[in-house]
A protein has these predicted regions:
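Conserved active-site alpha-helix within GNAT-family acetyltransferase domains
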Residues: 137, 149-151, 160-177, 181
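Conserved beta-hairpin
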Residues: 58-73
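A short beta-loop-alpha structural element at the N-terminal edge
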Residues: 6-20, 24, 28
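Conserved acetyl-CoA-binding loop-helix of GNAT-fold acetyltransferases
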Residues: 126, 132-145, 169
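Conserved acyl-donor/pantetheine-binding loop and adjacent beta-alpha core of acyl/acetyltransferases
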Residues: 72-126, 131, 181
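Conserved GNAT acetyl-CoA-binding A-motif
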Residues: 117-120, 146-159
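C-terminal "cap" of GNAT-fold acetyltransferases
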Residues: 152, 156-161, 180-194
């Protein structure tokens, strides 16, 4: 019988492990790879995204990972909002024909963020070799315990339609669908406290 891995709230001493797992998990993400189709540019720019998105998560107890660091999640607590300008240096890695649609895309997604205090799931992903084994669900469940204890809303944007049933099983509801030009869709999703 397979042993159930432990999921923990982790600190910045494990930043590289968590960011590596998430980076691996997004290598085939439809939206992220539409934004960064070139492999080298993906690795370079996604590293910037991981650095910027993980800072507030580590600073505020919003990082969850399994004990082997095959997967992780980055949550931003209520009151934390990243300025999209910090990602501007990565825009040069977006194909020129997609820049305008990508910027429209992010602008439209931003309109779905709840006005109420909420926890924002910026990223959750697993090493692809560990997907489909329930690990993502364990990581999500551990974080949602804290969100529920605080009586807060949880919000995310699903950039991969294959993941939507996972989120729905954990109580998330689809708020809409965002796409521009030939971009893959993203689905903003919200979950009210249980």
């Amino acid at each position: 019988m397979m042993e159930i891995p432990k999921v923990n709230n982790v600190d910045a001493s494990k930043a590289e492990e968590v960011k590596a797992a998430i980076t691996l998990g997004f290598t085939a993400d439809p939206l992220i790879r539409w934004i960064f189709p070139d492999p080298q540019k993906y690795l370079r720019s996604f590293a910037v995204w991981m650095d910027e998105f993980s800072k507030p998560s580590f600073e505020n107890g919003g990082v969850f990972a399994d004990e082997n660091y095959y997967g992780g999640s980055l949550w931003h607590p209520p009151g934390i909002h990243l300025d999209s300008e910090i990602l501007a240096p990565t825009f040069a890695d977006i194909p020129e024909s997609r820049v305008e649609h990508a910027l429209q895309f992010f602008d439209e997604l931003g309109k779905y963020h709840p006005d109420e205090d909420h926890w924002y799931l910026a990223f959750i992903a697993l090493d692809p070799s560990k997907q489909g084994q329930g690990l993502g669900s364990l990581i999500l469940k551990e974080a949602l315990k804290i969100v529920d204890e605080q009586g807060k809303i949880a919000y995310l944007e699903s950039s991969n339609p294959q993941n939507m049933t996972l989120y729905e099983r954990h109580g998330f509801e689809t708020m809409g669908r965002v796409e521009f030009g030939d971009s893959p869709p993203a689905h903003p999703m919200i979950r009210y406290p249980k």
